[in-house]
């Protein structure tokens, strides 16, 4: 390598998207267990908009980004999992809004040649979230009846496709006709509006209820989500897009049929390289087999990170938003 500096996008103050500005920084040197990666695609996520806006405190100046894919260009002295030239993806790097980034070898996986850079950059966070929900939190088997809220969203769209590949009957909720078309295209069996979804599911199941509900919406849906479960069904609350769920009396679960409730997070389901490799490996297999098709809605050059944040915050996306350095 001959480069000694790299272009990054960083913030020196928090605020509106225009605080994201390009800056030249020294090219980082990998530590003993790190690899240096030439960035090919960066996944943009809402947490970065919260960091930029000052909702979540970060040390300034700050280069955002954790999710990316690229080519290994240098390795640390103790690296054994990667070599120069390998294709890599991760959800656990730092400072990925840059032409190059560092990541520990334990927090990244090899990317098959058959997977595009865009898919590799779009997959890790939303893909592993969908995978741990349906494979580990409640393992879905053929014949299970499942509700996943927000079927036109990133996690919802991936989950629907994986659930159908497993032989589940999939119910989902959406907020508009346009989003209903997206969820239907993903393969959902029953696409419902949020208003009255519980009564509709009871009718569609003749009152029998569902095996599991995956709820990333939170405050606006959770209480009704509990009512659509069968006896000993499970509610998996994995997010709060509409706000956090208020505390409730656990005795309520008894009255609704001895229900189970859990509040998982991806960090606890991707704790080591073996687990990350298993999840990402199955996701890559699903792409290669045609069971999973990712939707990249919009791509932006690295220098247009501010525009990308504006686009994401408008909440009109129909898939993943990427930076392509």
Predicted regions and their residues:
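A glycine-/small-residue-rich N-terminal strand-loop-strand element
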Residues: 69-93
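C-terminal hydrophobic helical "lid"/dimerization subdomain
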Residues: 2-4, 273-325
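Hydrophobic/small residue at the entry helix of a nucleotide-binding pocket
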Residues: 155
């Amino acid at each position: 390598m001959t480069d000694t500096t790299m272009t990054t996008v960083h913030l020196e103050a928090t605020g509106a998207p225009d605080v994201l500005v390009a800056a030249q920084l020294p090219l980082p040197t990998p530590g003993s267990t790190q690899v240096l990666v030439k960035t090919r695609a960066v996944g943009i996520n809402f947490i970065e908009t919260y960091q930029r806006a000052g909702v979540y405190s970060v040390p300034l100046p700050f280069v955002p980004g954790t999710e990316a894919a690229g080519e290994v260009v240098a390795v640390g002295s103790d690296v054994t999992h990667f070599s120069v030239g390998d294709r890599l993806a991760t959800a656990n790097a730092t400072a990925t809004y840059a032409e190059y980034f560092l990541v520990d070898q334990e927090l990244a996986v090899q990317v098959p040649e058959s997977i595009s850079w865009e898919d590799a950059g779009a997959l890790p966070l939303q893909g592993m979230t969908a995978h741990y929900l349906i494979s580990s939190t409640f393992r879905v088997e053929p014949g299970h009846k499942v509700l996943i809220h927000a079927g036109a969203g990133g996690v919802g769209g991936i989950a629907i496709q994986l659930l159908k590949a497993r032989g589940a009957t999939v119910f989902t909720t959406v907020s508009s006709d346009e989003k209903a078309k997206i969820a239907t295209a993903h393969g959902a069996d029953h696409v419902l509006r949020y208003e009255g979804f519980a009564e509709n599911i009871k009718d569609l199941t003749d009152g029998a209820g569902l095996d599991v509900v995956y709820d990333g919406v939170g405050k606006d849906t959770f209480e009704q989500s509990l009512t659509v479960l069968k006896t000993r069904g499970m509610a998996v609350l994995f997010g709060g897009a509409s706000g956090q769920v208020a505390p409730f009396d656990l005795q309520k679960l008894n009255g609704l049929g001895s229900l189970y409730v859990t509040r998982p997070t991806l960090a606890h389901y991707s704790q080591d390289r073996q687990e990350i490799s298993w999840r990402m490996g199955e996701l890559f297999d699903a792409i290669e087999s045609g069971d999973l098709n990712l939707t990249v809605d919009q791509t932006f050059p690295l220098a247009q990170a501010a525009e990308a944040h504006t686009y994401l915050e408008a909440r009109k996306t129909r898939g993943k938003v990427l930076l392509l350095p």
